[in-house]
Design a protein with these regions (language model features):
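An N-cap/entry alpha-helix motif that binds or orients negatively charged groups
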Residues: 1-29, 405-423, 427-455, 459, ...
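Surface-exposed amphipathic alpha-helical tracts and adjacent flexible/coil segments at the periphery
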Residues: 1-30, 108, 320-362
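Alpha/beta enzyme core
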Residues: 1-270, 276, 282-295
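Short hydrophobic alpha-helical segments that form membrane-spanning helices or hydrophobic packing faces
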Residues: 20, 299, 389-393
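A mid-to-C-terminal "edge-of-domain" accessory segment
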Residues: 29-35, 146-147, 154, 161-162, ...
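C-terminal helical cap(s) of enzyme catalytic domains, especially alpha/beta-barrels
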Residues: 84-85, 142-143, 149-160, 302-327, ...
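C-terminal catalytic subdomain
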Residues: 272-281, 286-333
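C-terminal non-catalytic accessory extensions
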Residues: 446-498
């Protein structure tokens, strides 16, 4: 993006740059969130009353940055919240967001929340350097009756706490009443709003209901009020949404919230896979980003089950980078597919080292490859030498990817884990037979025994006639299945959505 494009998008409210003036004096590297830029990923972390502490949360921060999280939210509800926040802000290179109400009620009941407590807490966190606040000001008194028919009610911590406050006092949401004063604090320190969705659906059964949409309409009004104060704002979204409702939800938000960047949690597209919700939500996140979301809040395997640990943070970041990257490719974001194409060229050239270097997680890719065949041959353990389609294709014709110097397979390339016996493979390429190569590459001696011809697996390259090839594929008494390849009758000729 050019400087002029960034200025125009920020001025229109379609792009935000969460960068607190006080955080800029530390290690912050500012970034932008909006439809004009690539899709961003947020990682949540924070100590709970029963688990973790400051050191562990700082370690999670570093781990999230390692796995390309674009922002991090500190959602601590236990321990020394102030010290934990200070430590995270001092170490982070990415924008940090918080939910100030968590600090407001430490040591007191939600019913005791007052205007003074709200403004003092927001001011203190802004002075510390927090880059964006999640404020659940869109939950109003008139929305509370709408959740009575829900299966799971209110699943947002901030939303449920403020609903309890309103019922106790018989008054409108105090965050809504204090909105303009909070805006002044944000303007002073350049804190961005992430307007919280306190009535987001917590299950597919509650998706797109009156409570969710009613709050979203109020959020659109709050966004306009923030803009009038010169404060940047993005909007948080659901949650749990069936696949067929995601596009509608994204487009509705853009209309009701005047194009402000949408920041969604998932959404999960099914509720019955606890332990795998980083996958169920990444599916929804990909669709959400394609249809309008600007930032995706990751979900880890621990979602609904417990506090994420270090490896859970990695799993969530990787799943959501896949979702964001996939959407950017589909949207045609310039340069988003470059690495994919380069990796395909390396794969076509059978250049393993470049293949690993271009991958998102080179160490994991190399480990999986070396598990069965820790030598860089012109095939892998999945197919072996004779069944390698890429190798066979290269025998038929030369691909463009194999002609460039950077993708050419260097036969001297080898894994750092090679032993002397395996190193002979690379020294004698073109001399040894495939059987001898397999024997040398075997992790254990005797794994491939070429002397015992009776145990040798039949290979298609050993046969040339059709009758003999069919015998290999058939067990006694069986017949080959002929596939029907005519056009299916129920495929749509035109997709009205597209």
């Amino acid at each position: 993006l050019t400087p002029e494009q960034v200025r125009d998008e920020v001025a229109s409210g379609r792009l935000v740059i969460p960068a607190n003036r006080n955080h800029l004096t530390k290690k912050l590297d500012p970034m932008a969130i909006g439809r004009a830029s690539r899709t961003k990923v947020n990682a949540n972390m924070g100590a709970s009353p029963v688990s973790s502490g400051t050191d562990e949360e700082v370690d999670k921060l570093k781990w999230a940055e390692r796995w390309t999280a674009d922002t991090v939210m500190d959602l601590s509800t236990g321990g020394d919240l102030d010290a934990c926040r200070e430590a995270i802000l001092g170490e982070s290179t990415v924008p940090i967001g918080t939910v100030p109400i968590y600090s407001m009620i430490i040591g007191r009941k939600i019913e005791d929340l007052s205007r003074e407590i709200i403004l003092d807490t927001c001011r203190h966190q802004a002075e510390q350097g927090v880059d964006y606040f999640t404020i659940h000001a869109g939950v109003l008194q008139e929305h509370i009756p709408l959740v009575r028919d829900r299966v799971i009610g209110i699943v947002s911590r901030g939303g449920s706490l403020l609903a309890k406050w309103m019922i106790h006092h018989g008054r409108q949401n105090i965050m809504y009443e204090c909105w303009d004063d909070i805006c002044e604090i944000c303007r002073e320190h350049d804190v961005t709003f992430s307007v919280g969705d306190g009535l987001r659906p917590g299950g597919l059964a509650d998706a797109s209901d009156a409570a969710q949409i009613g709050e979203l309409s109020t959020i659109g009004h709050l966004v306009e009020r923030a803009w009038r104060h010169g404060v940047q704002a993005m909007v948080e979204g659901p949650g749990h949404v069936p696949v067929d409702q995601i596009e509608w939800n994204m487009k509705l938000q853009r209309r009701l919230c005047h194009g402000a960047p949408f920041y969604v949690l998932g959404p999960l597209v099914t509720d019955m896979f606890p332990g795998y919700d980083h996958i169920t939500s990444a599916i929804g996140a990909t669709m959400a980003a394609y249809h309008g979301a600007s930032m995706l809040c990751y979900v880890t395997p621990k979602e609904h089950l417990g506090l994420p640990k270090r490896d859970d943070v990695k799993q969530g970041c990787v799943a959501y980078r896949i979702a964001a990257h996939s959407a950017d490719i589909a949207l045609g974001i310039p340069g988003s597919r470059d690495n994919d194409d380069e990796l395909t060229k390396a794969r076509a050239a059978l250049n393993w080292q470049r293949h690993f270097d271009l991958s998102f997680d080179p160490d994991l890719a190399r480990a999986y490859h070396d598990e069965d065949l820790d030598v860089d041959t012109d095939f892998c353990a999945m197919c072996g030498h004779d069944w390698c389609s890429v190798r066979i294709s290269k025998e038929i014709q030369e691909f463009a990817s194999g002609k460039t110097e950077e993708n050419a397979w260097e036969r001297s390339k080898r894994s750092a884990a090679l032993n002397d016996e395996q190193r002979k493979i690379l020294e004698q390429r073109g001399v040894l037979s495939p059987e001898e190569i397999h024997k040398l590459a075997a992790k254990k001696k005797g794994k491939a025994d070429t002397k015992d011809k009776a145990t040798k697996a039949a290979c298609h390259s050993d046969y040339v006639d059709e009758e003999e090839a069919r015998k290999i594929q058939l067990a006694p008494g069986e017949t080959l299945v002929e596939l029907r390849t005519e056009e299916a009758h129920n495929l749509p000729k035109h997709d009205p959505v597209i």
